[in-house]
Amino acid sequence: MYSISTAGIDLIKHFEGCRLTSYQDSVGVWTVGFGHTGSDVRPYMHITEEEAEQLLKDDLVRFEKCVNDLVKVDINQNEFDALVSFSFNLGTTF
């Protein structure tokens, strides 16, 4: 079972960017931190950098599990990180 590496997290953070005040994304979903969405995100809420980091780590657990459950071939850490980043960005609903 893989876990996302520090480099993988840094890549996600780089492409997501960090917004400490919630905003509506391009499809109208309230988002905060490094791309965190969900019922806990309220309009114009404010979080700290530390809270944004924790939300990202908590969010990634679900995507790590999904990638670990679905990938049935040997992959390396970089490939795993890329798949977690991809699923974090696009979701895992089929």
Regions found by a protein language model. Name each.
Residues M1-F94:
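Cell-wall polysaccharide-cleaving catalytic domain and substrate-binding groove, primarily
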